[in-house]
A protein has these predicted regions:
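Hydrophobic transmembrane alpha-helices that form the pore/transport pathway of multi-pass ion
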Residues: 1-32, 43, 207-229, 259
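Transmembrane helix boundary and interhelical junction motifs in multipass membrane proteins
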Residues: 1-5, 35-41, 122-124, 200-210, ...
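Juxtamembrane and boundary regions of transmembrane helices in multi-pass small-molecule transporters
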Residues: 11-17, 21, 33, 53-97, ...
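Small-residue-rich segments of transmembrane alpha-helices in multi-pass membrane proteins
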Residues: 23-34, 92-103, 151-166, 270-276
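Transmembrane alpha-helix interface/packing and boundary motifs in multi-pass membrane proteins
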Residues: 24-36, 115-119, 192-206, 229-240
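Membrane-interface helix termini and inter-helical loops of multi-pass transporters
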Residues: 41-54, 87, 169-181, 215-216, ...
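Long, contiguous bundles of hydrophobic transmembrane helices that form the permeation core
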Residues: 67-140
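Transmembrane helical segments that form the transport core of multi-pass membrane transport proteins
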Residues: 108-222
């Protein structure tokens, strides 16, 4: 969606930064709602055995309320941008889209969600949807490979190497040993530890560190849900906090729009704090 946002804001002569930050933070907040929303949620879904619909029932309200909070914060932080309500005409005609591809994508998504709702294993449901898309594709492999952002893949390869090195040297284990007493307290303490670890070693390694510990908690389900919520929303704290943030920043940079680390913090920090407060409060009531 980054090219789409840039195209619209440039056509309307608006500052693209607030909309790009809104796009990235919304992607992170929205992904908290389901097991398939992001990689760490999938790990938690497999490890915890929480049914797909139950997981969504607990965390979808966090995503909805979090979206509302993020919108309000962006409007306040960039009030000058949103105070000007006069929008010029973009001069474009009707929007064109590839209807068969849209239908195929919706059907594949529906098959996956139906399988997950019926209790099918997460990997099997995802592979079934992917297989449906593969056997009906018409795009040549060369074109697909040409659209891959190889520089971003190299960046993530390096990031995972650094994370792996920290684990091999025992640095993450020592850090987790210090944080473990707080994590075992559950609730806000567990969420805080999840946020800190997610921004130090990334959210997926943080969840993997917690995986052997959570079954020992007094209420493992509540702990898993708190961990899913906190490690996901932690991605909004900094520009480097999530894959969505990095993809947005990289694609914007390629098109001449630079989202700086400091600029992102202006909205990222309050959005993270507000959504975490919502998540902790909600799970404290329903968990």
């Amino acid at each position: 969606f980054t090219p789409l946002v840039l195209g619209i804001t440039q056509a309307l002569r608006r500052n693209p930064i607030p909309y790009l930050i809104g796009l990235a933070t919304a992607a992170n907040i929205g992904s908290v709602a389901t097991i398939t929303g992001n990689p760490q949620n999938m790990i938690i879904g497999v490890a915890s055995g929480i049914p797909y619909l139950r997981f969504a029932g607990y965390l979808t309200p966090v995503a909805v309320l979090g979206m509302a909070a993020a919108w309000a914060i962006l409007v306040v932080v960039y009030r000058r941008e949103f105070a000007d309500r006069a929008l010029p005409s973009d001069g474009n005609g009707p929007v064109e889209f590839h209807r068969p591809l849209l239908v195929k994508g919706l059907v594949a998504t529906g098959v996956m969600v139906a399988g997950l709702a019926a209790g099918a294993p997460i990997p099997l449901a995802a592979l079934l949807a992917a297989a449906l898309l593969l056997i009906t594709r018409r795009v040549e492999p060369q074109r697909v490979f040409g659209e891959v952002d190889w520089s971003l893949l190299v960046f993530f390869s390096g990031l995972f190497m650094v994370t792996g090195a920290l684990e091999k040297t025992g640095a993450t284990a020592r850090l987790f040993a210090v944080a473990r007493p707080l994590a075992e307290a559950g609730g806000a303490s567990l969420a805080a530890v999840g946020v800190v670890l997610s921004n130090l070693v990334s959210n997926v390694p943080a969840v993997l560190l917690f995986r052997p510990l959570v079954p020992q908690f007094a209420n493992p389900q509540a702990a898993w849900l708190t961990l899913a919520m906190s490690t996901t929303l932690a991605g909004n704290l900094t520009l480097l906090g999530s894959v969505a943030n990095l993809i947005m920043a990289e694609m914007a940079r390629e098109r001449g729009v630079y989202v700086s680390f400091g600029e992102y913090l202006k909205a990222g920090v309050p959005i993270t704090l507000a959504t975490l407060a919502i998540g902790v409060a909600w799970l404290g009531v329903v968990g």
